[in-house]
Regions:
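Structured functional modules or segments
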Residues: 1-72
Length: 72
């Protein structure tokens, strides 16, 4: 388990918003697990259709965090 963060710090804008274009390798959020901040990158290019987790919410391993419309 970990904690989902939508931005690099509380005063910053989110990494991504609904409707944003993202490229493979772009950081889309941070998940804190065991006091380590892990930057999560998107695996393929596309458009963010939905953010499925609220900021600062607990998340589990393999939980889906975003809905992405592939640009392939």
């Amino acid at each position: 388990p970990g904690t989902f963060y939508s931005s690099p710090d509380p005063d910053s804008a989110p990494f991504v918003n609904i409707g944003d274009n993202v490229n493979a390798g772009d950081t889309v959020c941070i998940v804190e697990a065991m006091k380590i901040m892990n930057e999560i990158q998107v695996e393929e290019s596309g458009i963010i259709e939905e953010v499925l987790v609220e900021n600062s919410s607990p998340v589990e391993f393999d939980q889906v965090l975003f809905k992405l419309k592939s640009s392939k």
